[in-house]
Swiss-Prot record:
One of its GO terms (biological process) is nickel cation transport. It comes from the Archaea. Disulfide bonds: none annotated. Coiled coil: none annotated. This is Putative fused nickel transport protein NikMN. Gene3D superfamilies: 1.10.1760.20. Pfam families: CbiM (PF01891), PDGLE (PF13190). InterPro entries: CbiM/NikMN, PDGLE_dom. May be involved in nickel transport. It is found in: Cell membrane. One of its GO terms (cellular component) is plasma membrane. The chain crosses the membrane at residues 8-28, 39-59, 70-90, 98-118, 135-155, 175-195, 211-231, 268-288.
């Protein structure tokens, strides 16, 4: 769902930069003085690691967990939006995952729409069944985020195809992929609620187990990259663009483009890139936590 450079008109890209900055700025304002736990940084790092696990899907595409609804459920909408924004910004600036001109739109879709919709859907129906609420929140959150992406691309003349193409492609694919997103969200929320209910209540942060899970996801990420490469995978948006004969026009190549290191074995490079990205996300997460406590 990461929109690359060249897909959005500059006016559309600029509009969503403004909207995203406004919402994130308000989120920072709402969090000032709050006692955020280290859960903020850990959730951000876990989502970054989970997004590196692209699993291939028959037909030449792939999918990965996005985690916006999960971030909202565990952190609340304001902290959840900031955590996702940290992940997306690092993905863009360090790994060129998503275009720099489209960063505002990507933040809007995955860090704002996905998080806020997921959070409020979950809260609205949580009292009936926690697991079902988390599943529905994950499914609706990612589907609406994809629909927004389809609208942004479809109204941009740069892409060359209108809403009749972009909305069905983005909406249908992600409504199906949302079933996996919802299942993972429900599984994680249910497990944490049973094992560490204080984490769900945001009164504590997960301990060494959470860090071990993050490390495990990073460790196996090269295997996922290898498996996906065998079937020639691409993400749904990239796959659709290829079928339409469109090409990306990257403006910024990133420090470690495509999660690799120049001159290094691609799978070792993926592992190192994952470690670097996780450390950066953790550091920024803890820095924002400290700022919120002292501001």
């Amino acid at each position: 769902m990461h929109i690359p450079d060249g897909y959005l008109d500059l006016s559309i890209a600029g509009l969503f930069y403004i909207l995203s900055i406004a919402v994130l700025g308000y989120s920072i304002y709402r969090l000032r003085g709050q006692k955020l736990t280290s859960l903020f940084g850990i959730v951000a790092a876990a989502i970054f690691a989970a997004q590196m696990l692209n699993w291939p899907i028959p037909g030449g595409t792939s999918a990965h967990f996005v985690g916006g609804a999960l971030a909202g459920i565990l952190l609340g909408p304001y902290a959840g939006a900031l955590a996702m924004a940290v992940v997306l910004t690092i993905q863009c600036l360090v790994f060129a995952d998503g275009g720099i001109t489209a960063l505002g739109a990507n933040v809007w879709n995955m860090a704002i729409v996905n998080v806020f919709v997921g959070y409020y859907v979950y809260r609205a129906i949580e009292r009936f069944n926690r697991s079902a609420a988390a599943f529905i929140a994950g499914w609706i959150g990612i589907t609406l985020a994809a629909i927004f992406a389809g609208i942004e691309i479809g109204i941009s003349t740069s892409f060359g195809y209108g809403l009749k193409v972009t909305l069905p492609v983005m909406g249908t694919w992600h409504a199906l992929l949302g079933l996996v997103e919802g299942t993972i969200t429900a599984g994680v929320v249910s497990y944490i609620a049973a094992a560490r209910p204080d984490v769900i209540e945001q009164k504590a942060a997960p301990g060494k187990l959470a860090l071990a899970v993050i490390a495990a996801m990073i460790a196996v990420s090269p295997l996922f990259a290898y498996a996906a490469e065998l079937v020639g995978y691409s993400e749904p948006l990239e796959n659709a663009a290829a079928m339409l004969g469109l090409e990306e026009n990257p403006i910024y190549e990133g420090l470690l483009p495509d999660y690799t290191l120049p001159g290094l074995d691609p799978y070792a490079g993926t592992l190192i890139a994952g470690i670097v990205g996780t450390v950066i996300v953790l550091a920024l997460g803890f820095a924002l936590t400290r700022y919120a406590r002292t501001a």
